[in-house]
């Protein structure tokens, strides 16, 4: 499976790391991080990230899924012709596009929301202002899935993650996202398999030998 995550100035990694973590750790997926330029981008959390490829370098590459985080610097990316051009070339009949928070606006400008229901963390004044955002198709719901286009409000990142995983056909245990108000000590006691424990002991031994040397 080929999956891309888009980066831009002040992108919100917090909104997508539940999803990206599950894709990598639970399903062994490798993600391509894409951006307009090959440079360091600073997320809204202050983390510095470097893309694997620029949009130009992946022209012609077909992704199974493209993930867009929100951003605090909305207009920097909205008027970035390289980002919008990349999105315009996405075939949403083949590619699942998942955008959260403010990033559905990028889909709108690229024409990917035309005649589709959507949501997002968008101010209604901006929905009124930009004609590419079809107000009659905006649903005030945490997550909206219309065929291969998934959009969400920022706080709904867990449901967003579930929806993307389901659409990709990646199944998790039914209680994976469940949280309780009380946990017994037994539920919070963890043990290794014997074979895994032996591997860890070997690794510890290697580190301890290095320190002694």
Task: Label each PLM-derived region with a short phrase.
Residues 11-16, 42:
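Short N-terminal binding/cap micro-motifs at the start of the first secondary-structure element
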Residues 2-12, 21, 25-38, 47, ...:
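Active-site-adjacent pocket-lining segments in enzyme domains
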């Amino acid at each position: 499976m080929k999956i891309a995550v888009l980066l831009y100035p002040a992108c919100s990694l917090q909104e997508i790391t539940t999803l990206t973590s599950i894709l990598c750790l639970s399903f062994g997926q490798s993600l391509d991080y894409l951006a307009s330029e090959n440079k360091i981008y600073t997320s809204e959390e202050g983390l510095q990230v470097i893309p694997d490829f620029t949009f130009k370098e992946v022209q012609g590459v077909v992704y199974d899924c493209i993930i867009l985080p929100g951003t605090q610097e909305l207009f920097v990316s909205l008027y970035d012709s390289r980002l919008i051009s990349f999105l315009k070339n996405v075939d949403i009949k083949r590619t699942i596009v998942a955008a959260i928070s403010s990033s559905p606006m990028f889909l709108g400008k690229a024409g990917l929301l035309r005649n589709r229901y959507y949501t997002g963390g968008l101010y209604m004044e901006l929905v009124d202002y930009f004609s590419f955002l079809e107000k009659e198709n905006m649903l005030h719901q945490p997550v909206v899935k219309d065929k291969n286009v998934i959009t969400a409000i920022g706080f709904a990142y867990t449901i967003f993650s579930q929806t993307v995983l389901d659409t990709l056909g990646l199944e998790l245990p039914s209680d994976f996202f469940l949280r309780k108000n009380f946990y017994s000590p037994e539920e919070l006691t963890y043990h290794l398999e014997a074979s895994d424990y032996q591997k860890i002991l070997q690794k510890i031994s290697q580190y301890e030998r290095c320190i002694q040397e």
